[in-house]
């Protein structure tokens, strides 16, 4: 019997038995140890029964045992030999190769994703460029069409304005013809020997009047023919006629200044302006730096090829063209609508 008892005492104690004995010596329960170590009661029970959880790594298991030993004041050196036998450190599986292969797959997938993204970006850029080019070509074609139409209208208007230019030149003809008549007046008295040739136009008229009054009744028809042409244009040179067109021009300028349309060009621009009566005031291309002042019957219909190339002022107020400039398109607007 004594031999059997001594054999039982010589049986080596395990880590779980040593921890349980130390816990009982301090009067602690498994619940109290679990609360202090922030572990489950089942984990404390498995440690005391020398059971290792299958889903728990050996590193964590050894860490729990060390924390338990510190709590019950057991030296760590005493438990390490037993712990090495009961819970040997298991070699980790070859995880780096798996992670490398996963990383390679991720990189391959990221490469395809980036290629697809760049393809979409290039397609969007290409479509945007094509859309802009089509709009640009359409605007250029529209401007060329409007320029052709305006040139045709100008040619028609030019053919109709030929009689007007002839009428305007007719009043100027008497003025041109009066000058030689006035120059011829001094020569007439010279032939008669009454007034010297160096006299002015006014003394020449006086001399001619004197010749007519002092001439005898038997004056020949040739002399009267020479004197009468010099006297015939005299009423046309009267000072009462020039103020009449001047007054009319002043009234016209005052009436048209109220509806004046001023355009300052910063670059070359095609422009067409039509007033309320349907008259084309201007149609063509203006150079940069030019100023165009138009007057007609309001409202005005404007067609501008490049809205950003000019500024418009109507009745002293600027006309807003910002929406056409932002849209980068031909501007069609009406100015002077009440």
Swiss-Prot record:
Compartment(s): Cell inner membrane
Membrane topology listed for this record: Single-pass type II membrane protein
Keyword Transmembrane (UniProt): yes
Ranges of Low complexity composition bias in the record: 196-209
All ranges on the Cytoplasmic side of the membrane: 1-111
CDD domains the UniProt entry points to: HTH_XRE (cd00093)
Keyword presence, DNA-binding: yes
Molecular-function annotations in GO: DNA binding
InterPro entries linked: Bact_Cytoskel_RodZ, Cro/C1-type_HTH, Lambda_DNA-bd_dom_sf, RodZ, RodZ-like_C
One GO biological process term: regulation of cell shape
Region (Disordered): 151-253
Start-end of Polar residues biased regions: 151-163, 180-195, 210-241
Chain ranges passing through the membrane: 112-132
Keyword field: Cell inner membrane, Cell membrane, Cell shape, DNA-binding, Membrane, Signal-anchor, Transmembrane, Transmembrane helix
Known function: Cytoskeletal protein that is involved in cell-shape control through regulation of the length of the long axis.
Record remark on domains: The helix-turn-helix (HTH) motif in the cytoplasmic domain of the N-terminus is involved in the formation of spirals to maintain the rigid rod shape. As this protein is anchored in the cytoplasmic membrane, the HTH motif may contribute to protein-protein interactions to form the RodZ helix, which is localized beneath the cytoplasmic membrane. The C-terminal domain may be critical for determination of the rod shape by probably interacting with enzymes required for synthesis of the peptidoglycan layer, including PBPs in the periplasm.
Family: Belongs to the RodZ family.
Protein name: Cytoskeleton protein RodZ
Native source organism of the sequence: Yersinia enterocolitica serotype O:8 / biotype 1B (strain NCTC 13174 / 8081)
Top-level taxonomy: Bacteria, Pseudomonadati, Pseudomonadota, Gammaproteobacteria, Enterobacterales
């Amino acid at each position: 019997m004594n031999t059997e008892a001594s054999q039982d005492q010589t049986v080596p104690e395990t880590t779980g038995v040593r921890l349980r004995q130390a816990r009982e010596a301090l009067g602690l329960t498994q619940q109290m140890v679990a609360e202090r170590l922030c572990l489950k009661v089942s984990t404390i029970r498995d440690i005391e029964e020398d059971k290792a959880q299958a889903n728990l790594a050996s590193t964590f298991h050894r860490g729990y045992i060390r924390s338990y030993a510190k709590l019950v004041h057991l030296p760590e050196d005493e438990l390490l030999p037993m712990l090495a036998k009961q819970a040997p450190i298991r070699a980790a599986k070859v995880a780096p190769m798996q992670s490398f292969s996963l990383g390679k797959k991720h990189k391959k997938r990221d490469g395809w994703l980036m290629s697809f993204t760049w393809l979409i970006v290039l397609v969007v850029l290409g479509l945007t460029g094509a859309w802009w080019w089509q709009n640009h070509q359409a605007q250029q074609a529209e401007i060329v069409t409007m320029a052709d139409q305006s040139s045709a209208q100008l040619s028609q208007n030019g053919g109709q304005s030929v009689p007007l230019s002839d009428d305007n030149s007719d009043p100027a003809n008497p003025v041109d013809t009066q000058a030689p008549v006035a120059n011829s007046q001094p020569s007439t008295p010279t032939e008669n020997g009454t007034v010297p040739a160096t006299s002015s136009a006014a003394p020449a008229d006086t001399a001619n009047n004197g010749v007519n009054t002092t001439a005898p009744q038997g004056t020949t028809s040739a002399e009267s023919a020479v004197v009468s042409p010099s006297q015939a244009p005299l009423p046309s040179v009267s000072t009462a006629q020039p103020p009449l067109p001047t007054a009319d021009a002043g009234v016209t300028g005052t009436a048209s200044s109220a509806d004046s349309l001023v355009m300052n060009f910063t670059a070359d621009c095609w422009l067409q302006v039509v007033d309320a009566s349907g008259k084309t005031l201007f149609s063509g291309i203006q150079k940069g730096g030019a100023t165009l002042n138009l007057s007609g019957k309001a409202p005005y219909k404007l067609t501008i090829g490049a809205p950003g190339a000019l500024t418009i002022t109507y009745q002293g107020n600027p006309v807003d063209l910002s929406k056409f400039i932002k849209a980068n398109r031909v501007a069609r607007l009406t100015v002077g609508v009440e």
